[in-house]
Design a protein with these regions (language model features):
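N-terminal hydrophobic or amphipathic helices/low-complexity stretches enriched
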Residues: 27-69, 219-223
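Glycine/charged-rich beta-loop-alpha catalytic/anionic-binding loops adjacent to active sites
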Residues: 131-142, 232-236, 399-405
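Metal-dependent amide/peptide-bond hydrolase catalytic core
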Residues: 29-40, 44, 248-431
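Acidic/histidine-rich catalytic neighborhood of metal-dependent amide-processing enzymes
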Residues: 139, 144-222, 264
């Protein structure tokens, strides 16, 4: 039985409503959103978000000032697990990859379908980065504060708001802090969750909160394939061994050929030769050089075609260099090593999940914008699990820069946070 078969009842529930389309974005004509938004319980939950906002800001600062470099998230993960435990979640744990999680039980049977609400623990910054939070008016500034530390604190605020309002959901909600979302982390945390984790067959819907903008809904997973490709040869003195094959020439030819590939405007597909190195001195034919290549596409098929073209180019460039110069001391060889593999995928804009999220955005007086990006949602999307990524509320900027910032003006932040909470409640169901 497939994952989709096991989740069929929950998925059917997400798709039961009827909808209209306007301006390219699906608008809900019948969803749980209006009823939940108009309820006294949701009003109480949203009021608690406002009343409790200073604590949310304090949590943002606390977590931001715990460094979480790539592959070194353990200290922040430990602190976040303690926070999940303090919020009364059950089955709190750290898995083998370093993800932390805790369960908020719903009214449904134990072991039934559940909704995952996640944010990522890691940042792009190295361990020696100063992550002290500075405040100027309503702006907080520090590396990683918006991507994605604010979202971690927002998840805690959601739990407190639901508890304060006495909200009981139909499905369980699993709150998840993932590792390895950024860069060469290659989605290792969420990948482990969906391939090895104990909840992998129970997920009916997946929310990733990443960034600030509550109106941007990621429904398309931009896949990527990344190679660090080594070109090797015999090397030698640049003057005395002139005429021998040169791996630099083969690598340069390969890179130039890559940039001759013409790509269609749709599905959006890109390539880049990004990092290069090798050699020992200016007066030596290098024995080894390398370049890192990045390929991306919204389409799994287009990405696979581009990858096949690049791998063929590597072989062609090596053969051309071996034919052009002497191989008396040995030929040029090539070794492409995969350093990144993020699957492409999508969640249907007409799915119940997306429609509920769009309805929640519109209920707050915003307009929704559907987009494609590379986020933790790539993994569930590629597996056919309904998934979206959205912002956790408010505004921010300069992500991945040392002067990264968020604005913590309360009114607009609570408005944006209410979008996420309303969407979660609509998808998990309210008893």
């Amino acid at each position: 039985m497939t994952l989709r078969d096991r989740l069929a009842p929950a998925l059917a529930g997400l798709s039961a409503a009827c909808f209209l389309s306007l301006g390219g974005v699906a608008l809900a004509s019948e969803t749980p959103v209006p009823a939940i938004a108009a309820s006294a319980a949701f009003a109480e939950a949203k009021a608690h978000l406002a009343k409790d906002f200073d604590r949310t800001v304090a949590d943002i600062i606390t977590l931001t000032e715990i460094p979480a470099p790539p592959f070194q998230e353990a200290e922040r993960a430990k602190a976040y697990l303690a926070m999940l435990e303090a919020h009364g979640l059950t089955q709190t744990t750290t898995d083998a990859e370093g993800n932390v999680m805790g369960l908020r039980r719903g009214a449904g049977p134990a072991g039934g379908p559940l909704v995952v609400v996640s944010a990522h623990l890691d940042t792009v910054f190295p361990a020696d980065t100063d992550v002290t939070v500075r405040r100027e008016g309503t702006r907080l500034m520090a590396p990683g504060i918006g991507d994605d530390t604010r979202s971690l604190a927002t998840l805690l605020a959601f739990i407190r708001a639901m508890d304060a309002a006495g909200l009981v959901t139909e499905q369980d909600i699993l709150f998840l802090g993932t590792v390895g979302e950024e860069g060469q982390g290659d989605l290792r945390g969420v990948r482990h969750f969906f391939t090895e984790g104990p909840y992998r067959d129970r997920v009916s819907a997946f929310f990733s909160f990443d960034g600030s903008d509550p109106t941007r809904v990621v429904t398309g997973a931009v896949g990527s394939k990344r190679y660090r490709t080594f070109f090797r040869g015999p090397g030698g003195h640049s003057y005395g061994a002139f005429g021998l094959v040169n791996p630099m020439a083969a690598m340069a030819r390969a890179t130039a050929q890559l940039y001759e590939i013409e790509l269609p405007p749709s599905p959006r597909t890109t390539y880049s030769a990004s990092v290069t190195g090798g050699g020992v001195s200016v007066n030596s034919i290098p024995a080894e050089v390398y370049t890192e290549y990045d390929m991306r596409s919204e389409s799994p098929e287009a990405l696979a075609r581009l990858e096949a073209q690049l791998l063929a180019i590597f072989q062609e460039s090596v053969a051309a260099e071996n034919a052009a110069r002497s191989t008396a001391q040995g030929p040029i060889t090539v070794e492409p090593l995969v350093i990144g593999d993020r699957p492409a995928g999508s969640t249907d804009p007409d799915s119940g999940l997306v429609r509920s999220v769009v309805a929640a955005i519109e209920a707050a007086g915003y307009s929704a914008s559907l987009s494609a990006s590379s986020t933790d949602s790539n993994i569930p999307m590629s597996l056919g699990v309904p998934a979206i990524t959205m912002g956790s509320g408010g505004s921010g900027g300069r992500a991945h820069a040392l002067d990264e910032w968020i604005d913590v003006e309360p009114v607009e932040n609570v408005r944006g946070m209410g979008v996420g909470l309303l969407a979660i409640l609509a998808v998990a169901g309210v008893r």
